Amino acid sequence: MLIIPAIDIKDGRCVRLTRGDFNQQKIYLDNPCDMAIIWRKQNAKMLHVVDLDAALTGEMVNFLKIEQIVRELDIPLQVGGGIRSLDAVKRYLDIGVGRVVIGSAAVTNPGLIEEVLKIYRPSKIVVGIDAENGIPKIKGWTESCGMKDYELGLEMKQMGIERVVYTDISKDGMMQGFGYESTKRFAEMTGMKVTASGGVTSSDDLMKLVGLQQYGVDSVIIGKALYECNFPCQELWYNFEEDICIDHNFSTARKK
């Protein structure tokens, strides 16, 4: 089970939202690259980076911030947020991003998926499905899609998509556990590779996720729980990794 720390960028800074609500925003560090270095020092093998400004506007507002992270790190980035054109996909992959996540555009412009897959391998393109009660939400979770989450997944699979980042919106940022049943159901019904997202809070949640590997859930994106130092091993890293030279006394991190 691959654990992928999340970095959300808004106005150039590293933030976390609660259930995607921009009015419930918490700033953790001014420089997202510093946050990326911290997660790499804590043995991250991949990072999930989202340009929240781009998700709102469609403009790649934080492109240079993301490019800096790519340059500084030796692990792949998975990048999402407002990717609505072939040009946006190309710009990210050209700077060395490992794979891009296409969300709302997969619903509003499915032809983009076909266009992108004519040029890039499926391993480079991921579709993000954010669902509430089994119904995909798009455009910053403000609109509902006219199909079930698994129906959208199967449509993307037919086009050639192999992996989905599946987020249970009701759990995202709530620190109350992840959507076990919804994630299991989606993975079972689509037979796709699934990266779970939203609500993982504890080691117990991770152990439950391991039980879903048989259905194709092989990785998980974790945000707020890592930032709030919910995992005991993080204290060890903070206390003994003296070469982490960044001021990471953000939030409730318990660095002595």
Curated annotation (Swiss-Prot):
Localization: Cytoplasm
Origin: domain of life: Bacteria
Give the CC-aspect GO terms. cytoplasm
- Pathway as given in its UniProt record: Amino-acid biosynthesis; L-histidine biosynthesis; L-histidine from 5-phospho-alpha-D-ribose 1-diphosphate: step 4/9
Provide the disulphide bond pattern. Answer: none
Q: What is its EC number?
A: 5.3.1.16
List GO molecular-function terms, semicolon-separated. Answer: 1-(5-phosphoribosyl)-5-[(5-phosphoribosylamino)methylideneamino]imidazole-4-carboxamide isomerase activity
Asked if GTP-binding is a keyword of the record, the answer is no
Instruction: Give the residues annotated as active site.
Output: D8, D130
What family is it from?
Belongs to the HisA/HisF family.
Q: Can you name this protein?
A: 1-(5-phosphoribosyl)-5-[(5-phosphoribosylamino)methylideneamino] imidazole-4-carboxamide isomerase
Q: One Pfam annotation, family name? A: His_biosynth
